Amino acid sequence: MYEDCVKSTEDYYLFCDNEGPWAIVLESLAVIGIVVTILLLLAFLFLMRKVQDCSQWNVLPTQFLFLLAVLGLFGLTFAFIIQLNHQTAPVRYFLFGVLFAICFSCLLAHASNLVKLVRGRVSFCWTTILFIAIGVSLLQTIIAIEYVTLIMTRGLMFEHMTPYQLNVDFVCLLIYVLFLMALTFFVSKATFCGPCENWKQHGRLIFATVLVSIIIWVVWISMLLRGNPQLQRQPHWDDAVICIGLVTNAWVFLLIYIIPELSILYRSCRQECPTQGNVCQVPVYQRSFRMDTQEPTRARDSDGAQEDVALTAYGTPIQLQSADPSREYLIPSATLSPQQDAGL
C-alpha cells in the first residue's frame, strides 16, 4: 500500500500514507481550523457594527488582520505535508516567518494600546494600531524576500541543500519573529499595572498566548536542530516537527486569544450603557494634579473647544450631555408673597 501510494502520488504521498498518519491528522486539524477561523471572521464583522465603545472598536481591525494571518497559517500546513520541491520550498521559507510576524505584531500593537488604557489614558486610533502591526511585521517580509531571491537567483536550489543546512537557514530566518515574541511578552506584562481592571483581562490573554507560543517554539526548534539528528530521524521527522508546531500554535491563537476576546466583545455589546460604580478609578496623583489646575474632567473636541467628559467602565472618555442652544428653556420668575408686597 505504501509503495503504491508513493508511485501514484510522488510528492503528495503523505496524503494517502497509512503507515505515518501524522499528515492525515494534521491536515484534518488544519481544515477544521480553516472553517473555525472563517466563522470567527464573520462573527467579528457582525460585532464590529454593534460596538459602541471607541476604545474597544479601535483594536478590531487589527484583530481582523490577526485572524487573516491565522487563516494563512492553517493553509500553510499543506505546504509542509507536500514534500519539499521547487514550488513548496519558497512558500515555506517566505510565508512561515511572515505570517507569524503579522500575528505577533498584532498582539504587540494590541498590548501597546492596553498599556495606555489600563492607566486611564485615551486609546490609539484604529489606524495607528493597524499601522503599528503592519509596520513592525514589514521587516520580516523584507528579510524573507531577500533570502528567497538570493537562493533562487544564485542557482542553489533548495532541493540540493543538505537537511541540516535547510533547518539552520529556516530557523535563522525566524530570529526577528523570536524578537517580536520576546518584546510582546514583556509589553503584555506591563498591562498588569494600572487602575483600570477591566482592561487587564485583555492583557492577561495576550500574556498567556505569547507564553504558550514561546514554549511551543522552544520545543519544535530544539527538536528540529538537536533532537532529530541525535535520534537519527533527520530528515524524515523534520517536516512533521515544523508542521506540528505550526498547527499547534495556530490553534493556541484561536483558543487562548481570539475566542475569549470574542466572548468579551459579545458581552460588552449586550450592555447598552456602563453601570454606575464601575467607573475606572483615576490614580491619586492624577486627581491631585487636576484639582491643582482647576480643570477636572475637561477635554477638547474636534473644534478645539473644551468640554466636560466622563470615564466609562473601561476608562474611556465620553462626552457629557450639554444643553441644546437652539431650544428655548423657560425659567420661572421669582414672585413676592402678599406680606412682602405690602411691606414694599
UniProtKB/Swiss-Prot annotation:
GO terms for molecular function: G protein-coupled receptor activity. It is a multi-pass membrane protein. InterPro entries: GPCR_3_C, RA-inducible_GPCR3. Keywords: Cell membrane, G-protein coupled receptor, Membrane, Receptor, Transducer, Transmembrane, Transmembrane helix. The chain crosses the membrane at residues 28-48, 64-84, 94-114, 124-144, 168-188, 205-225, 240-260. Residues 49-63, 115-123, 189-204, 261-344 are cytoplasmic. Residues 1-27, 85-93, 145-167, 226-239 are extracellular. Predominantly expressed in hard epithelial cells, including the cortex layer of hair shaft, the keratogenous zone of the nail matrix and in the central filiform papillae of the tongue. One of its GO terms (biological process) is hair cycle. Induction: Induced by retinoic acid. It is found in: Cell membrane. One of its GO terms (cellular component) is plasma membrane. Its main location: membrane. Belongs to the G-protein coupled receptor 3 family. G-protein coupled receptor involved in hard keratin expression and likely plays a role in the development of hair and nails. PANTHER family: G PROTEIN COUPLED RECEPTOR, CLASS C, GROUP 5, G-PROTEIN COUPLED RECEPTOR FAMILY C GROUP 5 MEMBER D. Homodimer. This is G-protein coupled receptor family C group 5 member D. It comes from Mus musculus.
